[in-house]
């Protein structure tokens, strides 16, 4: 059974959820667009926890009712209760674990939109083709979730592939869903250009960065060097007669970003600044994560982009996520954006890991207090 401490935390969340629900009916909130959106967003973030808590309560009540029926004299009622309990009792542990996961402290960046970068790695043209397929996979997944997507920059490759592409994705808690996609994605298959039928291995790097706002990252204009040039299309030919493309260099870090998707230089500059802030924000988040890891003296998997995270084996129609030992089949569906189960598995795995870390930290703090 859940401890009283856990139940109190869950009940506090439920109380806050009810307060927010009441606020949405308040005319002063409904007439204030910004506040209405803020309240709605917070309520939506709490709703899964509240629904799970209420389902758990019903489960516990149903078990209690059926256990009471075991004391009845009627043998049919007792048999029915046994059958019900055989179905209900196995649901308790998974339900309790799920509720505990909801109490894991949230990543402060989880609510943010993201900038997604996909880069072809080892494998030549085949890597470029797979990079294009991963782009389509993420765009289709975003479409399924109702997110908005905008391609910010693309470098075309051969045979319809891409060397690298940057996409802005906006919607509800995008980073919380996509953050574990960062890393090296490996593909194993027979390329269309392979005459001997040999299986080739290629790699593509995916980076998912939370989009930073001005309040998150302050960038001094003195630290920015801007170059303008003419936009180029596939093969390098100029597609614009004006210098509308923008390249920004952040002098303190050496980070370079470019944007040439828009015809307006101002729009390209604004887009490039969003990309730059996201990269700087990611560096700061990684610095904070490293500091926490060093303090705990433990390494928690974070989907680091240098980590080989996943293999797409086409001859065997199999996807394997190496971090969590997860396997599924039907790659055509995966490449069409049907990746929710993979993402859910990653979220559950890392949430459980974070919960264990938090529990160890709380235990250590308690021991220190007792010694004091």
UniProtKB/Swiss-Prot annotation:
The modification N5-methylglutamine is found at residue 237. GO terms for cellular component: cytoplasm. It holds the Pfam family RF-1. Methylated by PrmC. Methylation increases the termination efficiency of RF1. Keywords: Cytoplasm, Methylation, Protein biosynthesis. One of its GO terms (molecular function) is translation release factor activity, codon specific. Belongs to the prokaryotic/mitochondrial release factor family. This is Peptide chain release factor 1. It comes from Anaeromyxobacter sp. (strain Fw109-5).
